[in-house]
Swiss-Prot record:
HAMAP family: PRAI (MF_00135)
Catalysed reaction equations from the record: N-(5-phospho-beta-D-ribosyl)anthranilate = 1-(2-carboxyphenylamino)-1-deoxy-D-ribulose 5-phosphate
GO biological process, one term: L-tryptophan biosynthetic process
Protein family according to the UniProt entry: Belongs to the TrpF family.
Gene Ontology molecular functions: phosphoribosylanthranilate isomerase activity
Keywords recorded for this protein, A-Z: Amino-acid biosynthesis, Aromatic amino acid biosynthesis, Isomerase, Tryptophan biosynthesis
Pfam families: PRAI (PF00697)
EC numbers, comma separated: 5.3.1.24
Gene3D superfamilies per record: Aldolase class I
Encoding gene, per UniProt annotation: trpF
Organism domain of life: Bacteria
Protein name (record): N-(5'-phosphoribosyl)anthranilate isomerase
Pathway entry: Amino-acid biosynthesis; L-tryptophan biosynthesis; L-tryptophan from chorismate: step 3/5
InterPro entries in the cross-refs: Aldolase_TIM (IPR013785), PRAI_dom (IPR001240), RibuloseP-bd_barrel (IPR011060), TrpF_fam (IPR044643)
C-alpha cells in the first residue's frame, strides 16, 4: 500500500512522543478538553510539543474553544495546526484561521449519508477536514470513542477540494480495509493505541504502522 500519513492523537507523556516518532507518525495531537482522559494542561503540552522531532506536525485539538483559551494555547505551545472538534460553525472556523494564522482542521462527524453535506460547508474555510464517527448519543466526548462508521459512505466521493483525514475506530486490524474502501491518504487514531484510557502503548503504535506498511 502506498504511503498513508498517520496522526497519533491524545499524547500526554514524553515517552508517547518518542514512540509516535519511532512509529512513523506525520502528525501528533494534544487534547485540550477536560472531559477527555487525554486532556493535557498548557504547560504539559508545551513540554511535549518541544520534544516533537522536526518534520512531525504538532496539532492542538480543542472543542468549541473561546478566544481566551486559544490565545493561551497558541501563545505558549509551539504548534503547526489547530483541530476544531466541536460544533464550530463555518464562520467560527474562518475566524479562528484568520486570528491565529495557523492551518485549521475541522472535524466532521458522520453516521449517515446526509452528514457528508457538511464537507461542502467547511471545505472553503478549513485547510483540512477530519472525517470521524459521529458522537454517539449521550457521549461526552466528540471523538476518541473507538467507534467506526460506514466507510462505504465515502467510497463514492471522488473529488475533495482540501486534504482530509479518516478517523473513528481505526485499528491495526481494520485500517487496511478502511483505506481501501475510502481512498484515505491520512488516518487518525487515539484509543486503539492505548493500554488504558489516556495511556499510549508503543507496541500498538508500531503494530498500526506495520499494518499500513504491510497492507
Amino acid at each position: 500500500m502506498s504511503e498513508v500519513a498517520i496522526k497519533f492523537c491524545g499524547l500526554s507523556r514524553l515517552e508517547d512522543v518518542s514512540a509516535a516518532a519511532e512509529a512513523g507518525a506525520r502528525y501528533v495531537g494534544f487534547v485540550f478538553f477536560p472531559k477527555s482522559p487525554r486532556n493535557v494542561s498548557i504547560p504539559q503540552a508545551r513540554e511535549l510539543a518541544l520534544a516533537v522531532p522536526l518534520g512531525i506536525a504538532k496539532v492542538a485539538l480543542v472543542v468549541n474553544a473561546d478566544d481566551a483559551l486559544l490565545d493561551e494555547i497558541v501563545s505558549q505551545v509551539p504548534l503547526d495546526m489547530l483541530q476544531l472538534h466541536g460544533s464550530e460553525t463555518p464562520e467560527r472556523v474562518a475566524e479562528i484561521r484568520a486570528r491565529y494564522g495557523l492551518p485549521v482542521m475541522k472535524a466532521i462527524g458522520v453516521a449517515e449519508a446526509a452528514d457528508l453535506d457538511a464537507i461542502d460547508l467547511y471545505a472553503p474555510v478549513a485547510d483540512q477536514l477530519l472525517i470521524d464517527t459521529k458522537k454517539p448519543k449521550g457521549a461526552e466526548r466528540p471523538g476518541g470513542n473507538g467507534a467506526t462508521f460506514d466507510w462505504s459512505l465515502l467510497a463514492a466521493r471522488k473529488y475533495w477540494t482540501v486534504p482530509w483525514m479518516l478517523a473513528g475506530g481505526l485499528t491495526a486490524d481494520n485500517v487496511t480495509d478502511a483505506v481501501r474502501t475510502t481512498g484515505a491518504r491520512q488516518v487518525d487514531l487515539s484509543s486503539a493505541i492505548e493500554s488504558a484510557p489516556g495511556v499510549k502503548d508503543a507496541a500498538r503504535m508500531q503494530a498500526f504502522s506495520a499494518a499500513l506498511t504491510d497492507g
